[in-house]
Amino acid sequence: MGNISSYARTIRGVCLAATLRQGKFGETKISVRAVPGWDAAAVCQRFGGGGHPGAAGATSRLSLEETVKLLEEYILKLYEFCISYPWPEEWLLGCINDYKITDKGELENTPWYKYLVNYIRTMIQECMEKLEFAIRISERPDGPYMYGEMLEREKEMLEDLLKGQTLDFYYQAFEKISFGRLPAKKDDTVNVLCREKVQQLRKEVKKLLEDIRETYLLLSPEQVTERMQTAAPHVETLLKLVISYKEKLDEKKRKENIIDFHDMEHFALNILLKKQEDGSVTASEAAKEYRAYFEEILIDEYQDSNLVQEYILKAVSGEEEEKYNRFMVGDVKQSIYKFRLARPELFLEKYHTYSNEKGDLRRIDLRKNFRSRKEVIDTVNTVFAKIMRKELGGIAYDEAAALYAGAVYPENTGNESELLLFEKPQKEEEQNARQTEALGIAQRIHRLKKEFLVTDKETGNLRPVMYKDIVILLRTNSGWDEEFKEVLAKEGIPAYVAGRTGYFATKEIRDVLQFLRVLDNPLQDIPLFGVMKSVFGQFTDEEVAIIRSSTEDKKKNLYLCVKEFVQEQVLRAKCQAFCEKISGYRACTSYLTILELLQKIFTEYDYPAYVAALPAGEKRLANVEMLLTKAAGFEKNSYYGLFHFVRYMEQLDKYNVDYGEAGTLDESADVVRIMSIHKSKGLEFPVAFVAGLSKKFNMQDTAKALVVDVDMGLGMDYVNPDMRTRSKTLRKNVLATKMKLDNLAEELRVLYVAMTRAKEKLIITGILDNFETKIQQYQKLLEHTEKSIAVTEENMTGAFSRLMDTD
């Protein structure tokens, strides 16, 4: 097996080594690279065009728009989930069987059903805590005592609800829930704020219970079973399409001698483990060889492991032989790769079951933080002690989870953490919210440069802060980083946008790709709007608004509005010229290669000269040249044409197969770094701005027609194509709820990672709309909220997003 040092590598490296060692590829030379779903469009075209029985029926059940792109999206999404499971086909077939339930008894045994019953009980308990808080307020000397009797009766009603164990029980019990009117008795000795707080809490309880009924209890278990049976054949068709797609993709990779990162893991898994007919898993001879060879297995960043990796690690360790030689290191509070289907639950299961006493399965809590000053650590502990709960994220921020200062720093002043809130500009055309926040940060950086000292890494002494000591962390770079960079540049502050995925976000590439999307299909409003505002259209916001408002049909495509615009003569001529350009380029796509099409566009618009004249023009020009290189290389593969190139680039962007911006930055350069929180993981900076906290959480996936969970399968809307109606199903609602809570838990962990990047000073920033009103509301919240109120989905969503109600 070679020297032991050769196994100090990533788990995928170990998987590849194991695969090659077993002669998986013989003498064949293979290429290891990320393979996005770049040929899914062609596969879906064949299926959607009648190549697979029932394909159209599957999409019509899922959505009223029977399009290849929709089918492609579903197949790629389900493929992504299945390959995160140790045996992908087994997962897909399990999802099919999940829908083939025959009665209420089988329904009650499904994972999503059990999750729902537990979730309803948790929400009722939340209502109980709110009512108990209201009762305590009513019992105060200045409290609304006249409400006490009714509140007690309502508390008894909730106690009865907590006895429920089945959906059938709750379906019937919620039909009988009723709230009377609070007594109207007036008493001047009652504190007005106390009265309002009790009324507010009771209103929240009523709304929460009504939401539960509307979301989960409108159909009886029998009706739920019937709808699942109706959907079963369409689910089966869709999932068999995924199996077919996987087979075709695997075949294509074999022909081209390509393996991707998931292949590495699955090849290694199948070498190390054997699945028996009864479903059990046994170690292979190869696994036993590894067990005998490895004395210890040390795993770093264990919180980011997935289920496939867990099986592999377990296979090569000696646990089955009672040889406990796995040492797993990680911090579940920093597990921020759920979108890559990491399983923090693996870490949590061990965290909650292993004892901190000496033994075979022992947990060792590494509490000391050797990065940050006490001021930073105190801020992190204060915030997360209030918002991180076991119910949301699987871990309570208690003494075992809290940070303790271990770093030694020279005495200094001004290290207190700061929360900077900026008022949202009233006139967006003058300055948008992001620019306002960036300007506020720039002004704070100017003051830091004048007065703040940091500890020099080499000497250990204090010195004036430099630009390179400062980082601005963003939840997402897209749409934020370049704007921040431009504002800082105007303020005379050098800045650099760091990030592997900067290529697709750059203006020069984004504008071209939007233009190609429009040439592929002009009836796409969002790309078309971007093109109209770019150098390819040169329309102003006011002109687009005039065109958009020229029709009373609000559902009309923007392209048709442009094409049919007949009002102002000058603008009409501009619209006609724009449409003629698009039509001309669309005609060229039938005989020009992608490279030739791009060269034609760039020549006619003098695009390289335009790009070179922009700030950082040399780098931007290199990005454009890189796009031409990629276009030339694309058509050497199996697929041709604009449609496939657009899909190819979309998949590269979606699956983070990015090239990074052309050019690099010297690490010693004295510039402010702007980067995503994910990019910053593992890094540290003397001064960290955590910016953009007014940005709302992205919950778009929970509202889509198809939602997927690796443990609970898939849920989808119930669509009647004949009646052209759509309604949400119970299963989809449950999966969407779980997804939403998982996303919120992930947002908690992302915030934790961001705040713990700071070594000496932490500054948190955000934008407030209706500044004075929001500040007053926040003060009231602090004055009249008890710590005992649990952090639920609704409360957590409001932590920043509801308070800072901006997009």
Predicted feature residues:
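Short, hydrophobic/aliphatic alpha-helical segments
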Residues: 31-46, 243-248, 667-668, 740
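Gly/His-enriched, cation/cofactor- and phosphate-binding structural elements
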Residues: 1-72
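Cytochrome P450 core scaffold surrounding the K-helix E-X-X-R motif
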Residues: 694-704
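Conserved helix/coil segment N-terminal to the catalytic DExD/H
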Residues: 269-291
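Short glycine/proline-rich turn/loop motifs
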Residues: 218-229, 245-251, 255, 422-428, ...
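C-terminal accessory regions
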Residues: 536-538, 549-552, 668-671, 723-791
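Conserved motor-region signature of P-loop NTPase helicases/translocases
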Residues: 80-114, 118, 142, 214-218, ...
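Conserved ATP-driven helicase/translocase motor core recognized via long
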Residues: 75-259, 361, 439, 458, ...
